[in-house]
Amino acid sequence: MSTMHVEVVSAEAQIYSGEAEFLVAPGEMGELGVYPRHVPLLTRIKPGPLRIRVPGQAEEVIVAVSGGLMEVQPDAITVLADVAVRGDEIDEARAEAAKKAAEAALEKATDDRETAAARQALKTAIAELKALDYLRRRVH
């Protein structure tokens, strides 16, 4: 099977760089599956799990993204995520606590800046929890 190069980066770090046979991203209108030689595309992605099928590996690489942009070219995909964390690095207790803290901050927000920051923190926590949920369902 042919492959494409995938880059997933956040503002803080490069999260994934390598070849992939297939990628599924949480698109604005639902999941978006991309194979090599896909037509060029630029789209927004929403919070959720990004799934990358790596050649020669039985398990997909899972990355929680809190939103961002994805550029698709026939032989490459670049995901520019607001925040991204590899699924195997997510701490469930921390993500649950972050979600509760963000919900509380959203309720207490007094201006647009505080509201935007709380919404971004909530998106990040929800994306991590969705990725963990996907990983659990995949195992069972």
Curated annotation (Swiss-Prot):
Subcellular location: Cell inner membrane
Membrane topology, record value: Peripheral membrane protein
Protein name in UniProt: ATP synthase epsilon chain
Domain of life: Bacteria
Record text on subunit structure and interactions: F-type ATPases have 2 components, CF(1) - the catalytic core - and CF(0) - the membrane proton channel. CF(1) has five subunits: alpha(3), beta(3), gamma(1), delta(1), epsilon(1). CF(0) has three main subunits: a, b and c.
Gene3D superfamilies found in the cross-reference section: F0F1 ATP synthase delta/epsilon subunit, N-terminal
Source organism per UniProt: Laribacter hongkongensis (strain HLHK9)
SUPFAM superfamilies referenced in this protein's UniProt entry, alphabetically: Epsilon subunit of F1F0-ATP synthase C-terminal domain, Epsilon subunit of F1F0-ATP synthase N-terminal domain
Family, per entry: Belongs to the ATPase epsilon chain family.
GO MF assignments: ATP binding; proton-transporting ATP synthase activity, rotational mechanism
GO cellular component: plasma membrane; proton-transporting ATP synthase complex
Role of this protein: Produces ATP from ADP in the presence of a proton gradient across the membrane.
Keywords: ATP synthesis, Cell inner membrane, Cell membrane, CF(1), Hydrogen ion transport, Ion transport, Membrane, Transport
